[in-house]
Amino acid sequence: MQSLEQCVNSLEAIVHQLDGSVSRLARNGEASNELCEGILKIKRVFELVPEYDVESARLALFEEVDPMVKTLGDKIEKALIRKRRELENLRQTSELNSLRLSGDLYFSETGIDNQDMDVSTDAIAIASATDAELDELRALKARRAELQELLDGR
């Protein structure tokens, strides 16, 4: 309340000072009296607003903005979920491609024709696999590589 009183006092002081400036200009510039009256008129463009009106306007603004913010937050959350799913699918695709590449390397090194193997369902199986299944697949792949090294070493 004290700052409001300070604002009112400051505005009154400004109005008083402007009144004095206009009256001095009117006295000193009798020839340009029309200019002083037309351009230098004092216009009061401020008024005091009750605190109740300020609070009700603030509440109305919150009521208008809050639903928009919540809607935007929901949209962002859904987009994040979609992007996480897309990232997981890309990781699984990358894993599948690396498995295929390592399989192609194995077949090229051993000279075995990999055309006989049907891997057409591998993409579906790995794309729909869970993390635990992918971990098990990695472990089996590592075990297969170890066994192959043992066979190659003999």
Swiss-Prot record:
Its main location: nucleus. GO terms for cellular component: cytoplasm; DASH complex; spindle microtubule. Residues 72-96, 127-154 form a coiled coil. It is found in: Nucleus; Cytoplasm, Cytoskeleton, Spindle; Chromosome, Centromere, Kinetochore. One of its GO terms (molecular function) is microtubule plus-end binding. Keywords: Cell cycle, Cell division, Centromere, Chromosome, Chromosome partition, Coiled coil, Cytoplasm, Cytoskeleton, Kinetochore, Microtubule, Mitosis, Nucleus. The keyword Cytoplasm applies. GO terms for biological process: attachment of spindle microtubules to kinetochore; cell division; mitotic sister chromatid biorientation; positive regulation of attachment of spindle microtubules to kinetochore; positive regulation of microtubule polymerization; protein transport along microtubule to mitotic spindle pole body. Belongs to the DASH complex SPC19 family. Component of the DASH complex that connects microtubules with kinetochores and couples microtubule depolymerisation to chromosome movement; it is involved in retrieving kinetochores to the spindle poles before their re-orientation on the spindle in early mitosis and allows microtubule depolymerization to pull chromosomes apart and resist detachment during anaphase. PANTHER family: DASH COMPLEX SUBUNIT SPC19. Component of the DASH complex consisting of ASK1, DAD1, DAD2, DAD3, DAD4, DAM1, DUO1, HSK3, SPC19 and SPC34, with a stoichiometry of one copy of each subunit per complex. Multiple DASH complexes oligomerize to form a ring that encircles spindle microtubules and organizes the rod-like NDC80 complexes of the outer kinetochore. DASH complex oligomerization strengthens microtubule attachments. On cytoplasmic microtubules, DASH complexes appear to form patches instead of rings. This is DASH complex subunit SPC19.
